[in-house]
Amino acid sequence: MIKCAEDFGIDWVTVMSDPWAEASAFGIQVEYPEDTLPVDTGGHLPDATAASVMEHYNPLKNSRCLNRLKEIEIFRKQAGDRFFIVGWVEGPVAEYVDLRKATNASVDFLMEPDIVEKAMDTIVECAMSFIHLQIKAGAHCIGIGDSFCSQIGPDLYFRFAFERQKKLVELIHSENVMAKLHICGNTESILEGMIKTGVDIIDIDHMVPSMDRFAASLASHQVFSGKSDPITVIQNGERSTIIQSVRSDFIAAKGRCIVSAGCEITPETTIENMKNFKSSVFELQKL
């Protein structure tokens, strides 16, 4: 990660992606094939009631969580203050989905919401402990990944996620570091809520049509991050396409935007296009 940041002029280093770390600490069995996505293979909770009474995990006794803490310590030791160090936790909705699987979780949200909320409170309490340890290890910022929120609509977002995300953000701020919120997919219907959590950096997925009408809602300490399409623009686009995408997003955000992909950049992206993405930043100076 440090080498990548050095080669391509990236301003931060991050412990993502390992979104299954906390799930494995809760007991989910996860396999990590070489050069592809992790696969959850067992250990899922049988029902919402089981989720609501699950025990808190100890990050210091789980290998994936310990790896994250060690990564941050290495970043701090080797990169010092050259790069912005971003730690990570899963948000309540995403983590619940990991524990129950997507279809089961979706039914739970509709049929047993009160029981689901008990489980999510446990998830948040565990995340708070993990956040504290990551900050102690040297993180400048903690990202919160709550990907499935884009699939549940505004009503359920505000019931399950908003206050809990806000609680995590407030904890992060109380320890004098920044907070970042990432929700995959088209978050247009919940974007005002994401902003109101008070988080410092709001990731914008490429599926969000535009940041234009939301820019005025940002507080003075807030910025967007995004949202060039990882496939059609960054992986497959010509240099001019990449520059135009970055320019359009920057203008739409009224200049309140970190230049970033609108979700994860693919392994198939060429070095040339990564360099084009980097150079697109300097084109903004011409605006």
Task: Set out the residue ranges of the language-model regions.
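Glycine-rich, N-terminal phosphate-binding loop and its surrounding beta-alpha-beta segment
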Residues: 1-27
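Active-site loop segments of alpha/beta catalytic cores
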Residues: 4, 11, 36-37, 57-287
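A contiguous, low-structure linker/loop signature
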Residues: 19-60, 81-82
